[in-house]
Amino acid sequence: MAKEKFERTKPHVNIGTIGHVDHGKTTLTAAITTILAKEGKAKAFNYEEIDKAPEEKERGITINTAHVEYETENRHYAHVDCPGHADYVKNMITGAAQMDGAILVVSAADGPMPQTREHILLASRVGVEYIVVFLNKADQVDDPELIDLVEMEVRELLNEYGFPGDDTPIVVGSALKALQNPDDAEAIKPIKDLMAEVDAYIPTPERPTDKAFLMPIEDVFTITGRGTVATGRVETGTLKVGDEVEIVGMKDEITKVVVTGVEMFRKILDSALAGDNIGALLRGVQREDIERGQVLAKPGSITPHNKFVGQVYVLKKEEGGRHTPFFNGYRPQFYFRTTDVTGSIQLPDGVEMVMPGDHIDMTVELITKVAMGDNLRFAIREGGRTVGSGVVTSIIE
């Protein structure tokens, strides 16, 4: 039988369930697929299939993640659900599962718990801008006033971390009831309402091709008589012959150049798109003026920096990380896009040391400038092995 072609007819959005352990994230994920499967818009997954998520390796870090996909009337969704709290921390910091928006699951019976807060904080740090709330286990609460109280608490918590808590959609229901009675219109109504809110509230993300052009440089060589070629994979945007671009990073100054040719697999292109592996011929650039680790970018779109705050997950010994803690002034390599740059770290006040398995905010000062913006991912390496993974949360200078 021929493979089914992926029909890209609906806009695609990446989402995930977040929230405290045992508040019902996985049950809700199963309920969504089961109910949409009735309409032919998903493959139904049961709780066990999602819960036994396979291990994945992302930048050397082991993460358990379940991926399901489904459709609503308007959209195609890829949805991630993680069995363990540590998996969420790793997922969100490494960017293994990029989320355009999240469904925060809170038990109406328990209210917000420590991981509820931690996941909201992580979402705000790593650039997940949109959260829709599902107040689960509502069937276990007899007093409607209690549900109102929990709703108020959740809104306050969202406000505290910079989300618009007062305007955030909150849907009340029971994921288990919906999962057990997929033909009962009343039981499944909260799930349908939730998906309608997700459709309406989480905007369709900007496609990579619509963003400003950026290509991390992987290699540089000279073609006699024609000039210097920089190769790499276009991360975002488009590039046409004749475009002016900037060479950013590894130096204090930014150089402007004109692209006189674009090639892919030795074929000449008029233009390159996000995802293409290309060689860009640059006019008037000497071989020694450009190096791996820099980026080619649309003029004015990105700047070089060497001091920033990052949220970092430190690998455990079992993940191939350090066996011992590190302290203030630790000087590892920070791997951005295509290159390692040495940097020193400053821990937050009152933090003496960082243990393998911790996640923490740290201020980093690099010895050379790197082209960076908020939410840029990096790895921390020692002698070529990854010992941590991080995301830039704010730039200092």
From Swiss-Prot:
Which Pfam families does this one have?
GTP_EFTU, GTP_EFTU_D2, GTP_EFTU_D3
Give me the ranges of the annotated region G1: 19-26
Q: What is its main location?
A: cytoplasm
Provide the residue span(s) of the region labelled G3. 81-84
Enzyme Commission number, as recorded: 3.6.5.3
Q: Which top EC class is given?
A: hydrolase
> Where is GTP bound in this sequence?
19-26, 81-85, 136-139
Q: Any idea which positions bind Mg(2+)?
A: 26
Q: Which family does it belong to?
A: Belongs to the TRAFAC class translation factor GTPase superfamily. Classic translation factor GTPase family. EF-Tu/EF-1A subfamily.
Q: Which HAMAP family match?
A: EF_Tu_B
Provide the assembly information: Monomer.
User: What is this protein identified as?
Assistant: Elongation factor Tu
Question: What gene is this protein translated from?
Answer: tuf
